[in-house]
Amino acid sequence: MNPKDIYPDILKDIKLMQLASVRDNKPWMCNVWYVMDEDHNVYWISRETRRHSLEIKDNSHVAATMHPWFDKGLMNDPGQAMIISGQAKRLSGEECRMPYELYAERFPKLREFQSLEKFLNDEGHHYFYKITPDEIIWWDEINFPENPKQEVK
């Protein structure tokens, strides 16, 4: 069984990602609405003034996780999660076109929230950010109970 055959169906229903950034050896975690392309690059929108955005500007190393919520707790609810570490950056200009379309497909209100033209011209209140993964782990206690840590990249 290949984890790449499993997680796309699970992740399609998970819209919230936990994003970890760091500055001066002090980690920070936040939640953002995300999309992922076929190459596992991850995109989200945020203001430049948010703590995670400021930290990414100074230090591009980030980590992120996406997972279903668990109701039963330890030992009663096997876990599944995607864990990513990589480099993040703010996108500008034409770099925003493809993630805008992906994001608008998943979150249709984006078109009302901020136009593509504003992103392309770096004129909006929100900007696109991208994680290019260095490492991807699919943690799956359901399909791989003896070895839940499955390396994807």
Short names for language-model regions:
Residues K26, D71, E95:
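Residue-level detector of flexible, active-site-proximal loop/helix-junction positions
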Residues S53:
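An amphipathic, aromatic/His-enriched active-site/gating alpha helix that lines ligand/cofactor pockets
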Residues M1-M17:
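Extreme N-terminal tail/first-helix region
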Residues I14-E48, I56, A63-P68, N76, ...:
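Short beta-strand segments
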Residues D77-K153:
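Charged, gly/pro-rich active-site loop segments
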Residues R47-R50, T65-D71, E105-E117:
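Short acidic (Asp/Glu) patches
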Residues L11-K12, K57-D58, A104:
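Alpha-helix boundary recognition
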Residues K15-L16, H61, P108, I136:
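Generic structural signal for secondary-structure transition and capping sites
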